[in-house]
């Protein structure tokens, strides 16, 4: 299997979520299923079916997290420098609107655009890889091409 690049923070967050699921949520849902079973006929027991559905989701998420953690290749951005690569925090200026944006390039498993965590496989990240401060990049989006100037690169 292919390794999944991940920052130390991303791995820590995944381990935290896994611990929460295994030590708190899984036991709680097992208890809820047992209580719902006590209510009798399972064929029309909405509480039971709801709890089983939630259990299925929790077990699926646990498997997903365990898989990602086992394939994690932790890359500490603090040890990197130079042109943009995985782990870089990049300050950009939208050439059209002059709006400033800051993104950290991370792996798929920890990407969250709302938090400024940009998936390394995204079109913008792919355009930024290998570039340096002062360079401009153009990214094709569903709304048309967008240009960005790279103002600052840091590895924190």
Swiss-Prot record:
<dbReference type="InterPro" id="IPR006359">
    <property type="entry name" value="Tscrpt_elong_fac_GreA"/>
</dbReference>
<dbReference type="GO" id="GO:0006354">
    <property type="term" value="P:DNA-templated transcription elongation"/>
</dbReference>
<dbReference type="InterPro" id="IPR036953">
    <property type="entry name" value="GreA/GreB_C_sf"/>
</dbReference>
<dbReference type="InterPro" id="IPR022691">
    <property type="entry name" value="Tscrpt_elong_fac_GreA/B_N"/>
</dbReference>
<dbReference type="InterPro" id="IPR001437">
    <property type="entry name" value="Tscrpt_elong_fac_GreA/B_C"/>
</dbReference>
<dbReference type="InterPro" id="IPR036805">
    <property type="entry name" value="Tscrpt_elong_fac_GreA/B_N_sf"/>
</dbReference>
<dbReference type="GO" id="GO:0070063">
    <property type="term" value="F:RNA polymerase binding"/>
</dbReference>
<comment type="similarity">
    <text>Belongs to the GreA/GreB family.</text>
</comment>
<dbReference type="InterPro" id="IPR028624">
    <property type="entry name" value="Tscrpt_elong_fac_GreA/B"/>
</dbReference>
<dbReference type="Pfam" id="PF01272">
    <property type="entry name" value="GreA_GreB"/>
</dbReference>
<feature type="coiled-coil region">
    <location>
        <begin position="45"/>
        <end position="66"/>
    </location>
</feature>
<comment type="function">
    <text>Necessary for efficient RNA polymerase transcription elongation past template-encoded arresting sites. The arresting sites in DNA have the property of trapping a certain fraction of elongating RNA polymerases that pass through, resulting in locked ternary complexes. Cleavage of the nascent transcript by cleavage factors such as GreA or GreB allows the resumption of elongation from the new 3'terminus. GreA releases sequences of 2 to 3 nucleotides.</text>
</comment>
<keyword id="KW-0804">Transcription</keyword>
<keyword id="KW-0175">Coiled coil</keyword>
<dbReference type="InterPro" id="IPR018151">
    <property type="entry name" value="TF_GreA/GreB_CS"/>
</dbReference>
<protein>
    <recommendedName>
        <fullName>Transcription elongation factor GreA</fullName>
    </recommendedName>
</protein>
<keyword id="KW-0238">DNA-binding</keyword>
<dbReference type="GO" id="GO:0003677">
    <property type="term" value="F:DNA binding"/>
</dbReference>
<dbReference type="InterPro" id="IPR023459">
    <property type="entry name" value="Tscrpt_elong_fac_GreA/B_fam"/>
</dbReference>
<keyword id="KW-0805">Transcription regulation</keyword>
<dbReference type="Pfam" id="PF03449">
    <property type="entry name" value="GreA_GreB_N"/>
</dbReference>
<dbReference type="GO" id="GO:0032784">
    <property type="term" value="P:regulation of DNA-templated transcription elongation"/>
</dbReference>
């Amino acid at each position: 299997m292919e390794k999944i690049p991940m920052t130390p923070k991303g791995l820590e967050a995944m381990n935290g979520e896994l611990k929460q699921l295994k030590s708190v949520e899984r036991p709680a849902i097992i208890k809820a299923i047992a209580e719902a079973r006590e209510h009798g006929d399972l064929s029309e027991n909405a509480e039971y079916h709801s709890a089983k559905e939630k259990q299925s989701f929790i077990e699926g998420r646990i498997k997903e997290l365990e898989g990602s953690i086992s394939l994690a290749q932790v890359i500490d951005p603090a040890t990197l420098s130079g042109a943009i690569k995985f782990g870089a925090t990049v300050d950009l200026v939208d050439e059209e609107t002059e709006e400033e944006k800051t993104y950290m390039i991370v792996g798929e498993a920890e990407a969250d655009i709302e938090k400024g965590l940009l998936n390394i496989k995204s079109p913008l990240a792919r355009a930024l890889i290998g570039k340096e401060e002062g360079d401009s990049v153009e990214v094709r989006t569903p709304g048309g091409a967008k240009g960005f100037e790279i103002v600052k690169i840091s590895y924190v």
